[in-house]
Swiss-Prot record:
Cofactor info, note text: Binds 1 [4Fe-4S] cluster per subunit.
Entry keyword set: 4Fe-4S, Iron, Iron-sulfur, Isoprene biosynthesis, Metal-binding, Oxidoreductase
EC number: 1.17.7.4
Transmembrane segments: none
Biological source species: Paracoccus denitrificans (strain Pd 1222)
Chain positions recorded as isopentenyl diphosphate binding sites: H47, H80, H130, S229, S230, N231, S274
Pfam families, per database record: LYTB
Residues reported in the UniProt entry to bind [4Fe-4S] cluster: C18, C102, C201
This protein's encoding gene: ispH
Identification of the protein by name: 4-hydroxy-3-methylbut-2-enyl diphosphate reductase
Pathway terms, separated by semicolons: Isoprenoid biosynthesis; dimethylallyl diphosphate biosynthesis; dimethylallyl diphosphate from (2E)-4-hydroxy-3-methylbutenyl diphosphate: step 1/1; Isoprenoid biosynthesis; isopentenyl diphosphate biosynthesis via DXP pathway; isopentenyl diphosphate from 1-deoxy-D-xylulose 5-phosphate: step 6/6
Length: 316
């Protein structure tokens, strides 16, 4: 039998589920226990196929619009948040609904409303079309939120009154890219108001920091996550920017391109905030099967954040 080549696997920590994702999944599971199947979920509860498929197997039905939900069945709004019009329509139809919006996203919604109440126009740093961005922009009347994705976009926006602006950000952005966009906004609009610190959440920040911590030791980085997961895609970009010659997103172990990492002697592994640890275990097992493996954990922070589920699910 051929001798396995040696390889060190660096597991970044923190990785995987954040408190908002954990809460959202619990909400669907508790709703199924409380009301029985089917329970409808507007949009994927979190952006991970493995999670969505497992909840679907338990009786969750995933739809994109409220129109697809029968009025007599409960509906859950995804962790990414929804425009104000969605719960308003659910109330009009007298539907039972549970909002699984991450509390850190809801905090951004509150910021936007507070600035709007003071007569400020909002600038949102985020990715066009992402559900979180659609939900946050949908908290205010049309035209009240200007979206910028890049430093170049800052030069293109035309606010109503350049002296009456505030900015907010999507919670799952690249920390470094966002800092550059904020600097561009402050240079063009010196009076622009913003949060005490950017709205990028603790989990996004921590996962990016852990990738940077291992980047100098590895030949390749694998990020476990879904293609539609914003925070997972940012981790791939952070890895590349930190000097990883090969930085790749994989949903599961069967997507690993073994030829692409054939020459590697050290590989980093992390997981996006909506990827369960079972998928990390699967990847580690796949490396064990091919290599004489040494596994090292590199921990840059400890997370103990926990969010309560809504009261309606805690009541008997």
């Amino acid at each position: 039998m051929d001798k396995k080549p040696p390889l060190t696997l660096y597991l970044a920590a923190p990785r995987g589920f954040c408190a908002g994702v954990d809460r959202a999944i619990k909400i669907v599971e508790m709703a199924l226990q409380k009301w029985g199947a089917p329970v409808y979920v507007r949009h994927e509860i979190v952006h991970n196929k493995f999670v969505v498929d497992s909840l679907r197997d338990k009786g969750a039905v995933f739809v994109e619009e409220l129109d697809d939900v029968p009025s007599d069945r409960p509906v859950i709004f995804s962790a990414h948040g929804v425009p104000k019009a969605v719960p308003a329509e659910a109330r009009r139809r007298e539907m039972v609904f549970v909002d699984a919006t991450c509390p850190l996203v809801s905090k951004v919604h509150v910021e936007a409303e507070r600035h709007h109440a003071e007569g400020l126009q909002m600038v949102m740093i985020g990715h066009a079309g992402h559900p979180e961005v659609l939900g946050t922009m949908g908290q205010l009347p049309e035209g009240e939120v200007l979206l910028v994705e890049t430093v170049e976009d800052v030069a293109r926006i035309e606010p109503r009154d350049p002296g009456r602006l505030a900015f907010i950000t999507q919670t799952t952005l690249s920390v470094d890219d966002t800092a550059a966009i904020v600097a561009a906004l402050q240079a063009r609009f010196p009076g622009i108001r913003g949060p005490a610190k950017e709205d990028i959440c603790y989990a996004t920040t921590n996962r990016q920091a852990s990738v940077k911590a291992i980047a100098g030791r590895i030949d390749a980085l694998l990020v476990i996550g879904a293609p539609n997961s914003s925070n997972s895609r940012r981790l791939v970009e952070v890895g590349s920017a930190a000097g990883c010659a090969y930085s790749q997103l994989v949903m599961r172990a069967d997507q690993i391109d073994w030829r692409a990492i054939a020459g590697a002697r050290a590989v980093g592994v992390t997981a996006g905030a909506s990827a369960p640890e079972v998928l990390v275990d699967e990847v580690v097992a796949a490396f064990h099967a091919r290599y004489d493996l040494t596994v090292e954990m590199v921990e840059t922070a400890r997370e103990n954040v926990e969010f309560k589920v809504p009261r309606v699910l805690r009541e008997a």
